[in-house]
Amino acid sequence: TIQGIAGKAVKEMAYHIRHAGEWVIRLGDGTEESARRMADAAEALSIYVGELFEEGAAEDVAALPRRADLRATWEATISEVFAEAGMTFEPSKYPQSGGRDGRHGEQLGHMLAEMQSVHRAHPGATW
């Protein structure tokens, strides 16, 4: 059912938020090298923040929250995690856009292949 899928998705998101946050804190508040690398990674990914909140066709569905309405909560969560890591996160002044319209760079294919590798290696597996 939709309710069951949504319930599982909420649990999965909570897990991933917690897990990623713990790594940001661990690395940002770790050695000088780990903090530098975390800062570099955050800066490199900051150009994509705006795309998280761009409107798409799915936003026309009344049951879904508008992406733009989620931004303040996202920013508060990110700010809290980065502050705990002794860092700050600033979205890029020159954001990427167009992903929801199908405009993607070459890197997307590589990322999708990596994310799908376990599923392809073990079809039908569940956890």
Language-model regions: role of each:
Residues 3-62:
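A contiguous pocket-lining binding segment that forms or flanks enzyme active sites
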